[in-house]
Structures are given as structure tokens and as C-alpha cells.
């Protein structure tokens, strides 16, 4: 079947009332960004639907795939745009039925948005079904459990007919909910947390704490790859890589072993807080899960949060670990997350970290060294990368450079 349009249905935009125009415009911008590099199409965003007009050479499968990853889209259907005549609709219905298997069943489903159309829903179903049955003697009607369903939408401008409905990502268009800073560790949880807030229309930049030589270049490349996977959904994402070795070594030198994890997280939060203000973000996002590890008890969260007045969002707070793993697999980050390269959250882990840290004690331990100066140095030396969906890792860039130098 050669389709001439893609019909894009909005997600929760239908709930946005007077703000809908803003949301539709943002979604159209996101669609154009996602389809960059492809040709043979024109995007037409309307109040209640978006239509992608297709030229003969358009790659409909690739366009549909990319659209299915965009937040704010509920579903996509390849459609035929048909004149508002019974003859044109009947011809299109027969065209659909030509693809049906022998002895299969079908039904006609009609939605009549144009209430001024001269035929009602029942009449259209009867006439179109009759046209198909007259043309084929090896298929039959089954209105309850059909093998195929020819869907007909009668709209003001035209008739749209289709069979397939491809699920979209749902949620709200990224760019409608403000900006946050995602603390991206390299584990399973934080990429899922990032995806969850993006699904609510939030733009993210990511921060990663890198402690060479204790953490390797492979650990850094792993985080770049996780960011790249997230960028497939929303376009370029800035990744801020913090040189954290000095701070982490000093914490492990002067803080009581049971409190090093708490203090390390507090230092991370202080750095993140400074960066939040620099980039104009409204909140910090992390992948913490209540009770999962010692630093994620309520007592620990209280002690760690105390160093910032910036809201900290924890989308995975009440998830089971298995739920997080399932989501990680769904979004395509799981296999990268489980690569065995240690990050700064796993090195120097004490044997018996405190689960109910005493706030006064941790403040006392930190008072013996000038961490503010170290934090400022770390922020000043942040490496910022703009990660796109086709971003090459450091190793790939070096290999390509060597090849070019050789040639």
C-alpha cells in the first residue's frame, strides 16, 4: 500500500486548553528536529492532529520509527487522504482489502468529526463494507473480532483512511516543562529517571562526576553512550563532566569511613547546585530509589538535600528494582548501564555506611577542610560536551583521527 500521509495523534495535549497552541508548536519543532536528515515530507501541525504529507520517495518506515520515539505523540498511522465522496472512499476500502489474506475477516470503523457530512456513521459502514464484499468473495465481515479493521475518519478537509496504529511515546512535548539537571551516574537508575522527566515535557542537561585514575575512560564513554541514547528521543543534550578526584580523595581522607558516602553525595549536590544556577535549570533530577542503598534512606536524603535549596526530583523513588530494569530495557539503556566500569559512586564504598546519618556529625567532619574552594575548582574545570544521537565516543574519534592522519 502506498500511503500519502502520516496521521499523528497528540498525547496529553488535548488537556491543555488555552495553552494548546504553545504545546503544538513545541511538538512540531521537536518533530522537525527528530526528522532532520530525512526528506520527502512536509509537517503540518493542526490544533487536534498533525499530518505529515509524504512524497513518493519518503522513507515512511524511518519517519514513523522516529515519530514513535517523540514525547507528546500518542500514536501514528499511515493513511490515505481521500476525497469526500462515496466513490473515492469505496475505491480506497477496496485497495485496503486487496492486502487481506484469503478467508480473513474485517470490519469498517467510522469516526465522523464533520457532522455536516451527508451520510451518517452507520450508512458509511454499510456502504463501504458492501463495496468490499462485492469485490471479494473470499473475505467476510466480523464486527467483534476482525482480522483487519479499515478505519475511516471523516474530517472537515478530507477523509482519512487507515488500518495500522503505531504506538507513540505519550506524555508531553519536551521543552514545555522547563529545564532540569540530571545526575547521570552510569548505572541503571539515572537514565530511566532522565527519561521519565523528559516524558513530562522537561528538558534535561546531564552532570557526571568523573574521578580519574580511579574511574576509567571506559566509564566516561559509557555515560556518553547513555546520554546519546537519551538524545535519540529529544535531540542534543549537554553533558557536563565534573573532575571530582580532588574532592573525593579529600572526603575519604578526613571524613569518618561510615560517613564518606553521605559526605561525597553532599559534595556532588553542592556542585550540581552551582551548575543549576549557571545553566538556568529549575531542579535537580536523580535516580534515587527509597531504601535501595544506604545513601537512599529518608535520613540520608535529608542530610544530603540539606546543602541545596534547589528542588530535587526523584522520579523512581517508589519503584521496585525490577520495574526500573524493565523500563531500562524498554528505553534501550540497560545493556550499556550494566557494562562493568566503576563510577565514582562505587569506588571507595565503605563496608558499613551509615544509613541514618547524624546531621551534626557530617557537618563536623566536613568543617575540617575547605571544600568550597575545591568545589569552585571542580565547577571551573567542568568539561561540557553536546551529545547528539550520532555522537561518536572518544575512542571512535581518536581512531578516526589516526586513520585520517595515516591517509
Swiss-Prot record:
Record-level Gene Ontology MF annotations: ATP binding; CCA tRNA nucleotidyltransferase activity; tRNA binding; tRNA-uracil-4 sulfurtransferase activity
THUMP domain: residues covered: 61-165
Domain of life (superkingdom): Bacteria
Sites where the protein binds ATP: 183-184, 208-209, 265, 287, 296
PROSITE patterns linked to this entry: THUMP
Pathway of action: Cofactor biosynthesis; thiamine diphosphate biosynthesis
Subcellular localization(s) per the UniProt record: Cytoplasm
Database matches in CDD domains: PPase_ThiI, THUMP_ThiI
Gene3D superfamilies in UniProt: 3.30.2130.30, HUPs
Keyword annotations from UniProtKB, A to Z: ATP-binding, Cytoplasm, Nucleotide-binding, RNA-binding, Thiamine biosynthesis, Transferase, tRNA-binding
Entry-linked InterPro entries: Rossmann-like_a/b/a_fold, ThiI_AANH, ThiI_fer, ThiI_N, THUMP_dom, THUMP_ThiI, tRNA_STrfase, tRNA_sulfurtransferase_ThiI
The reaction(s) this protein catalyses: [ThiI sulfur-carrier protein]-S-sulfanyl-L-cysteine + a uridine in tRNA + 2 reduced [2Fe-2S]-[ferredoxin] + ATP + H(+) = [ThiI sulfur-carrier protein]-L-cysteine + a 4-thiouridine in tRNA + 2 oxidized [2Fe-2S]-[ferredoxin] + AMP + diphosphate; [ThiS sulfur-carrier protein]-C-terminal Gly-Gly-AMP + S-sulfanyl-L-cysteinyl-[cysteine desulfurase] + AH2 = [ThiS sulfur-carrier protein]-C-terminal-Gly-aminoethanethioate + L-cysteinyl-[cysteine desulfurase] + A + AMP + 2 H(+)
The keyword tRNA-binding belongs to this UniProt entry's keyword annotation: yes
EC code(s) of this entry: 2.8.1.4
GO terms for biological process, alphabetical: thiamine biosynthetic process; thiamine diphosphate biosynthetic process; thiazole biosynthetic process; tRNA 4-thiouridine biosynthesis
Cellular component terms per the entry's GO annotation: cytosol
Physiological role: Catalyzes the ATP-dependent transfer of a sulfur to tRNA to produce 4-thiouridine in position 8 of tRNAs, which functions as a near-UV photosensor. Also catalyzes the transfer of sulfur to the sulfur carrier protein ThiS, forming ThiS-thiocarboxylate. This is a step in the synthesis of thiazole, in the thiamine biosynthesis pathway. The sulfur is donated as persulfide by IscS.
HAMAP family registered for this protein in UniProt: ThiI
Family: Belongs to the ThiI family.
PANTHER family xrefs: TRNA SULFURTRANSFERASE
Protein name in the entry: Probable tRNA sulfurtransferase
Record organism: Staphylococcus aureus (strain bovine RF122 / ET3-1)
Species lineage: Bacteria, Bacillati, Bacillota, Bacilli, Bacillales
